[in-house]
Amino acid sequence: MDKSKRPFIKSKRSFRRRLPPIQSGDRIDYRNMSLISRFISEQGKILSRRVNRLTLKQQRLITSAIKQARILSLLPFLNNEKQFERTESTTRTANFRTKNK
């Protein structure tokens, strides 16, 4: 077929492969907080394998390391920053109301 007769074929874009999130020299360990913290969301949840772009074996090792760090209280189970902000704002409004009376 002639190229002019193929109207729906798109030109290929250049593909740049992303670097793997875990290098070959990185050790997946519960004490390696700089590595573990990359795979935890802002709320303290373990991110999924699809989001992390990890292999199955790496995801299992990361998950077990995070859980072990939580048990040894190196990591919090939840990040409740929003909850603390709410309690501070409610106490401020309560104090403001009592001062006006």
UniProtKB/Swiss-Prot annotation:
<dbReference type="GO" id="GO:0006412">
    <property type="term" value="P:translation"/>
</dbReference>
<keyword id="KW-0699">rRNA-binding</keyword>
<feature type="site" description="Not N-formylated">
    <location>
        <position position="1"/>
    </location>
</feature>
<keyword id="KW-0934">Plastid</keyword>
<keyword id="KW-0150">Chloroplast</keyword>
<keyword id="KW-0694">RNA-binding</keyword>
<dbReference type="InterPro" id="IPR036870">
    <property type="entry name" value="Ribosomal_bS18_sf"/>
</dbReference>
<dbReference type="GO" id="GO:0005763">
    <property type="term" value="C:mitochondrial small ribosomal subunit"/>
</dbReference>
<dbReference type="InterPro" id="IPR001648">
    <property type="entry name" value="Ribosomal_bS18"/>
</dbReference>
<comment type="subunit">
    <text>Component of the chloroplast small ribosomal subunit (SSU). Mature 70S chloroplast ribosomes of higher plants consist of a small (30S) and a large (50S) subunit. The 30S small subunit contains 1 molecule of ribosomal RNA (16S rRNA) and 24 different proteins. The 50S large subunit contains 3 rRNA molecules (23S, 5S and 4.5S rRNA) and 33 different proteins.</text>
</comment>
<dbReference type="Pfam" id="PF01084">
    <property type="entry name" value="Ribosomal_S18"/>
</dbReference>
<comment type="function">
    <text>Component of the chloroplast ribosome (chloro-ribosome), a dedicated translation machinery responsible for the synthesis of chloroplast genome-encoded proteins, including proteins of the transcription and translation machinery and components of the photosynthetic apparatus.</text>
</comment>
<dbReference type="GO" id="GO:0003735">
    <property type="term" value="F:structural constituent of ribosome"/>
</dbReference>
<protein>
    <recommendedName>
        <fullName>Small ribosomal subunit protein bS18c</fullName>
    </recommendedName>
</protein>
<comment type="similarity">
    <text>Belongs to the bacterial ribosomal protein bS18 family.</text>
</comment>
<keyword id="KW-0689">Ribosomal protein</keyword>
<dbReference type="InterPro" id="IPR018275">
    <property type="entry name" value="Ribosomal_bS18_CS"/>
</dbReference>
<keyword id="KW-0687">Ribonucleoprotein</keyword>
<dbReference type="GO" id="GO:0009507">
    <property type="term" value="C:chloroplast"/>
</dbReference>
<dbReference type="GO" id="GO:0070181">
    <property type="term" value="F:small ribosomal subunit rRNA binding"/>
</dbReference>
